Amino acid sequence: MASFPHPGSVTVCEINRDLITAQNLSDERAQETYGKVLGMVFSPVSFDSTPSSLQENEGQENGDKASGESKGLVATLQMKVADSLKQILQPTDVTLLSEIDLQGVSWHQGKHIIAFISGANQVTIRDYEDKDEKEPCILTSDSQRNVKALEWRPNGGKSLSIACRGGICIWAASYPGNMALVRSGGSALRGSLSRGSGTRWILVDFLRCQNDEQISALSWSPCGRYLASASYDSSSFTIWDVSQGAGTPIRRGLGGISMLKWSPTGDYFFAARFDGTFCLWETNTWTSEPWSLSSGSGSVTGAIWDPEGRFILISFSKSSTLGSVHFSSKPPSLDAHLLPVELPEIASLTGCEGIEKIAWDASGERLAVSYKGGDENYKGLIAIYDTRRTPIVSASLVGFIRGPGENPKALSFSFHDKFKQGPLLSVCWSTGFCCTYPLIFRSHVLP
């Protein structure tokens, strides 16, 4: 029977398909349940969850108005024509943005370091390996406006990319023996600051896009050399050679891009649009194959590759069933077929109206799912599934995770890909806490 956290309780961890709860957030309770097994406790990190998007948008609109006045009549008319065309081509992109699983939290691939969006213009970093760090580090910069997504750079030391308005901020850790270097010829970096008691972070580069676009999607190539970015303002995505600071735009079709996902092997690339379509690319010659599903499925809200890059799981805004696109041949072939992946009990138990976000751990054994709607008992919970990948993907419900505070809702969540003792899920809750949940079920981990 699936574990259900009663209202008023908070989830602590999983122990062998049993999701343990407590009355409140407590390091003592965490130490009792999983701390002795793992040798560490992942304390929750608090942040200001007060909505600030309205202030950000107002500031942007005022800035646009002042900019238009200063540029004169001709420039203002040109800007209005461009805005009108954008409204015609992409009429609902911004309103649909809230339905897309923007990557708001990310674990470093090789360290116990987590980064998450903690404000309209700021990012918080918590290093669980630094015993001397008394408080998390806050990253802010004049260049870092309206943060939408972030992702650690693979094979890049402690380097973090952040999607902002106008471009991408690249931060790097700087400490004795490993000084962070600013890229030669990079954009002027003004007002960059990291606040905290631990490692010092330096804004080493700002990859500037055209027309002050809002970057809303990021994905690193597995080797860490290339960074893909996209905006809901544009129908193209850009592949950046980060060391050179050079970007190459790639376009196919119309409409804003909502999501980018590079496969773990680097052979394939996934790009979804707000109109419900998506493309699968092979990265040898950058050839693509477009996909279009029935309108009854809605738009793509989440996508995750399996650990070997053989297929990709996709969630949809109007369906409680996932899709699994399997490749029929080896790369660079784009021959593939779509299979449904049922999520047992989620619709019958919760009454959900569609999937909001999904995350899959690197072992392929635990799948986290948040959903739209739900009755008073199930609203705002995260469903945890035990998954198998052979011969096809199947899932069985383990239970549900409940966050802290009143009426918590998951803003974003992600797994730590390289935590040896098992899946490690971190969730940023609307109540102002980033909580980490060890999912322990392997016999060699438990005493």
From Swiss-Prot:
<keyword id="KW-0653">Protein transport</keyword>
<dbReference type="GO" id="GO:0005643">
    <property type="term" value="C:nuclear pore"/>
</dbReference>
<keyword id="KW-0811">Translocation</keyword>
<dbReference type="GO" id="GO:0005783">
    <property type="term" value="C:endoplasmic reticulum"/>
</dbReference>
<dbReference type="InterPro" id="IPR045139">
    <property type="entry name" value="Aladin"/>
</dbReference>
<feature type="repeat" description="WD 2">
    <location>
        <begin position="142"/>
        <end position="181"/>
    </location>
</feature>
<dbReference type="GO" id="GO:0051028">
    <property type="term" value="P:mRNA transport"/>
</dbReference>
<feature type="repeat" description="WD 4">
    <location>
        <begin position="252"/>
        <end position="291"/>
    </location>
</feature>
<keyword id="KW-0677">Repeat</keyword>
<protein>
    <recommendedName>
        <fullName>Aladin</fullName>
    </recommendedName>
</protein>
<feature type="region of interest" description="Disordered">
    <location>
        <begin position="49"/>
        <end position="69"/>
    </location>
</feature>
<feature type="repeat" description="WD 1">
    <location>
        <begin position="97"/>
        <end position="138"/>
    </location>
</feature>
<keyword id="KW-0813">Transport</keyword>
<comment type="subunit">
    <text>Part of the nuclear pore complex (NPC). The NPC has an eight-fold symmetrical structure comprising a central transport channel and two rings, the cytoplasmic and nuclear rings, to which eight filaments are attached. The cytoplasmic filaments have loose ends, while the nuclear filaments are joined in a distal ring, forming a nuclear basket. NPCs are highly dynamic in configuration and composition, and can be devided in 3 subcomplexes, the NUP62 subcomplex, the NUP107-160 subcomplex and the NUP93 subcomplex, containing approximately 30 different nucleoporin proteins.</text>
</comment>
<keyword id="KW-0906">Nuclear pore complex</keyword>
<dbReference type="GO" id="GO:0015031">
    <property type="term" value="P:protein transport"/>
</dbReference>
<keyword id="KW-0853">WD repeat</keyword>
<keyword id="KW-0539">Nucleus</keyword>
<keyword id="KW-0509">mRNA transport</keyword>
<dbReference type="GO" id="GO:0005635">
    <property type="term" value="C:nuclear envelope"/>
</dbReference>
<dbReference type="InterPro" id="IPR001680">
    <property type="entry name" value="WD40_rpt"/>
</dbReference>
<dbReference type="InterPro" id="IPR015943">
    <property type="entry name" value="WD40/YVTN_repeat-like_dom_sf"/>
</dbReference>
<feature type="repeat" description="WD 3">
    <location>
        <begin position="210"/>
        <end position="250"/>
    </location>
</feature>
<dbReference type="Pfam" id="PF25460">
    <property type="entry name" value="Beta-prop_Aladin"/>
</dbReference>
